[in-house]
From Swiss-Prot:
Keyword Hydrolase applies: yes
Name of the featured protein: Glycerophosphocholine phosphodiesterase GDE1
Superkingdom of origin: Eukaryota
GO cellular component annotations of the record: cytoplasm
GO biological process: one example: glycerophospholipid catabolic process
GO molecular function: glycerophosphocholine phosphodiesterase activity
Family: Belongs to the GDE1 family.
Predominant cellular place of this UniProt entry's protein: cytoplasm
Keywords, sorted A to Z: ANK repeat, Cytoplasm, Hydrolase, Repeat
Gene disruption phenotype: Results in altered glycerophosphocholine catabolism. Leads to hypersensitivity to 5-fluorouracil (5-FU).
Function: Glycerophosphocholine glycerophosphodiesterase responsible for the hydrolysis of intracellular glycerophosphocholine into glycerol-phosphate and choline. The choline is used for phosphatidyl-choline synthesis. Required for utilization of glycerophosphocholine as phosphate source. C.albicans can utilize GroPCho through transport and intracellular hydrolysis or through extracellular hydrolysis.
Start and stop residues of the ANK repeats: 346-375, 392-421, 423-452, 458-487, 492-521, 525-554
Amino acid sequence: MKFGKTYVTHQIPEWSIYYMNYKQLKKIIKSIDSAANTNVDESKYPEVISDTLGSFFYDLDRDIEKVDSFYNTKFKEYNRRLNKIFQVLGYQDGQITHNIESSEELDEIINILIELKSLFRNLKWFAELNHKGFIKILKKLDKKLTSILSQHSGVSVGGVSNHNQEAYMGSRINALPFANGTEASNCLDSIHHILSRIETRNDVVQETIPVENNETSISALIKNDDFEGLKKHITIKSSQKFLISTLNKAALANSTKCIDVIWNQLDMLYDDSDFNGRNFFHQHIISLGKAQFIREEQIVPGEVTNRLIGGDNGPDNSNKNDNPIGLLYILNKLKHKRLILAEDHYHRTPLHYASQYGLVEVTRYLVEFGVKWGLINTSISIDDVSIWGDQEGLTPLHLSIIGKHPKTTETLLGFNKAQTLTCPNLLLLAVRLNSPQILNSLIVEGNIDVNYTDIDHRNETALYIASKLNHPDLVEFLLESNANTEIGENVFGWTPIFIAASEGFMTIVKLLKEYGASYDIVDDSGWLPMEHACLRGHLDVTDLLLPKNEKLLLYDMYHPENNLPRIPSLAASPVLTGSDDGTVSTSSIDKLPEPQKNTVNQFYKQLKNNSSNNVSRSTSPKRNKRYKPVKSFGHRYLNEDESLILLTLGTTDLRDTNVPVELNKVSLAKSFATELDTALSLSITCRHKLTNNPVEPPVVVDLPLEDFHGSATDPISFKLSNDLTVNDVIITFDIIPTYQVNKKVIGRAIALLKDAYTKVGPNLRSLNNSIAIPIIESTNLDILGTIRFEYLQVLPFKHKAMSIARSDTYWKQLVSTRVIGHRGLGKNLSGKKSLQLGENTVESFIAAASLGASYVEFDVQLTKDHVPVVYHDFTVAESGVDIPMHLLTLEQFMGFNTPTEKPTHTVDDEVLTRGKQRAQSSYQLSNNHNDDIEKEFANQRDERMKFTKTWKNQGYKGNLRGSSVASNFVTLRELFRKLPNNVGFNIEVKYPMLDEAQLEDMGEIGVDLNFFVDTILKVIYDENTTGRDIVFSSFHPDICLLLSLKQPTMPVLFLTEAGTAPMYDIRASSLQNAVRFSKKWNLLGIVSNALALIKTPRLAQVVKSMGLVCVTYGTENNEPELAKIQMRAGVDAVIVDSVLAVREGLREHNETMNEFEDSPTE
């Protein structure tokens, strides 16, 4: 998962405004790249960079000051509270020297220590997250500057350094207290030590009340309201603390007679020795609100617990009887009336605690008596922090909302009707907590403007936040309350419909449209909501957001003056990034790092000098400006003694919603000794099985994981050298405290990779890759939780013909878009009026080449005896049953389509090669049988095929005799020998993903991935002795990365449905994920379903901006006009069925391109 998202999700909600503004700093860095893509005079470029960097470091310094100030303030306050506990316990040199008078006092101390531990932990979490943010943003800046400086190597950019991270962290940040966290760590260690000592010592409590079993005895008397019996325990010598504690029990039991007995002995309702400064009302209300003693609570290890949420009794304490008869009885007897609103050491009144715990009736009594006695000024708002704020700056209303107590909130607002609330940001808090009732109260009773925005913090409205968090009920309520749909945040200029579209929230998009939200506007980067939705694979949402003027979607990178001007949203910056030359900014598209610019420069030299095989064209500077780099040969691959382990936490399957790292709940009492209540991390280490030494440094991941599939697009990798394999290593998963210097291992899981997957036969594997192993606690060997993961080992490929000597590139950015023949001359379709050549046949490939196809595309699979053959479907329907290819031998497979006539009676290869026209009647079709028995046999075979799933789903079968000019099946080896050397091969390596295998009902077993790829590569290196151009492609992500890592010369394209069809592997689920995957594994580019780029042509520039080739496929490509739309947008190649028609249709466009290139440029 990208840091930008985890940064937000890992923040302490009530401290969110004090974090560094990572998003804003990231936007400034991206503005450098936007300037690089425009026609800025290179002489002015150093000035542009200098100005941008000045803005960046100014904002960065303000963020550092904000984080440091907040951290120091909080630490000082928390440390003061901790020192007070040290004094009470006499804690020094690791020893507790004082005894506690009662178990109740001990419980109170433990409660305070646990709260302080939570506070220090949150503060440490706050510091660590900001520190990591500063490192990340400076690293991102250095990476961007390195890329730009290498690109503009001829321009002197004085004073600009690309080593800011090291310099700035060392001189400016690391010296500050929050950056090292030593003081907070020491405080946490002290608290942990005290709690551990208290749990193991029995002599800490020294009961001062002389009656044996007095607590049990007194509790029984109070429960029965036995005031006569209670009198025997109440004496003049009873301490004030004891009397207050006993009065609290009597009030809880509503025992009014016992209250009278205790009342007569009490002088005051507070004890000066109370180390929290709390009086009776504080203590009583806290006791009313608590469901259980805090040490008995269950927590999820490693998660941030919100200490401000009052107990587990539900909204407004609904799971507990809120009937404070005892409290009301005492209030009516009270003389010292100011006690009901007295503050403790944390500046909290009893009303604060009543609001925190959602005690509706108690809150009402306190407010009513406070107003009646003149203690509450009704002219002051209940959320006025200057009057009602505690040490955290929280008022009773804040606490009620944070605790999600709607009735308590309504009660507080009830006496505040005349006043408008002073903290309108409570509206945004209520939305984040998904509480419609509270939201309604704030708008109606609190008079908060429904369109309030926090200008200093991203300018997000309640409607925007509700849309972002996918709360349809809140969105509908806000829209009914006249929320403005056109107010957006100030980072990307996104209105609510942008965020809903990008996340694929269809219900919210429909609601926003219904209430008139504009969706033909663009954000700061010039992108429409529809384009954001399409990029992320939400094509159902895309169709809802079609602009009224559909021509807004068209994009011409060659003639930008033809592009219609786009209307920015009200939230967009006054000047959109972009330029007159047609460059498209992608700053809000979650861009990946730019490729190395020296590769670009080398590529353009080759393009200029080595274009003899193509249309002779010069590349104008104007055109150079637009093109991003295309990869060259010699990409990183595995040496013969190396292998790679790729480990994915969780799974790549979007249907699997199991948590990758699941930790069982533990009691807080247990967490004292185990440190499970601290922030936790997962340390993953690859170790040598015999020596236990790490093979590579461990990879540390912070818990909890917010994205269950985030690791899929960026798996954890361990490189094994010196011929090490999975047989020689183990993987350890250690649960460790995130912030402690000495990383104690709390729990461990161990995976023996050799035996992790169930064996299903030689050179075979199960398509189910998920592995679950238990985490064993280190102290008592209990099961702490479970880890789920997948792994893939990439083994090296060895062949004597493999080398990286060739330094040019197969794929040059040509003037005319390439045409690639789909399955040869085209995919066979049912109902075609013209005669079709059989798909994936030699005749079809030759015909495609003769008609002008640069490459022919075909599918390769392995037979049972491991021979690569050319065949498209996963199951071979010609057999009459749904049988997978890997269960048929070559002989069986080839026999299914062997003609009964002599070859001379089928099709004239010479005619196909020449491309001459012949009358259809002159062909001898393969279903003209000379023998009735053979005819009957063929009919029976065709009839059997109609029972297969392929036939039932499609109504036909490609290369079927009678519906096409059918021919023999062919092996990959034969194709190399039969097709002309000038015809390039686009080899689609066909391998089923789990969901595809399940859809085809073909069983969930496949050929071992390494063996599968190695077998195909061996045939290619054996046969390709003439330097034929070869490009690989595959829908299977693992096949693509194996092909990339096993050899250095043949480029790989990743095939993607781009959201046009459901794909459950997250890497194949959208165009955005396809781009990320291709970039990560150094692939040449992507082959996308054409529909996505026809709907939103500008997305081609997202692909190109990453230095990736963009190819499309699909029936839409058979329409020349649709092919032209893609070509104008920058698509490199189209895979088509109608080779001749599309090639002729594109000729006009190519001539236009010639005129464009030959025209003078400024």
